[in-house]
Amino acid sequence: AKYLLGLSTVQMNKRHDYDGADAHQFEVLEMLDLVKVKWNDGETKTAPEGLKQLVNPYDEREAVADRARSYLHANCAICHIDAGGGNSQMNLEFTTASDKMKLIDVPPIHHKFGIEDARLIAPGDPDRSVLLHRISIRQRGQMPQLATTLIDKPAVKLFRQWILSLEKPAKK
């Protein structure tokens, strides 16, 4: 495989409260000898605080686009990346530029679920958005596919908001 099913830098890049002791997760992993990077040695080019990081997708104080992109990275990009296990063409990593994601206003190459003029994400039109449909169901075609039996209702609300916030393309 050309990828690893696991956590990524942007997912782990945050401070955490360890029973009253606030510390950066990377520095804790370093102290436990689980990673070999020496963040404070002066040779590492970027300290953890300077690296990109996800936001909490359920924190409504954060920008809706950042929340949606963070959710996609944590729940979908594990397969939907270049050379990933998903056989669609999208790249849902948080660091991928929006115009390179192959997601917005792109027709699905697989199931359309009976949605007329379906798009993976139809800007401004949640009802034509296959991704929203997939996260709204728990049956064949659901996303995420693994380890989930319940619909993530806050995520469905988030993606509806995000899709509505996207500008519809000009009519041709």
Residue ranges and their predicted role:
Residues 1-172:
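Sequence context surrounding c-type heme c attachment/ligation sites in exported
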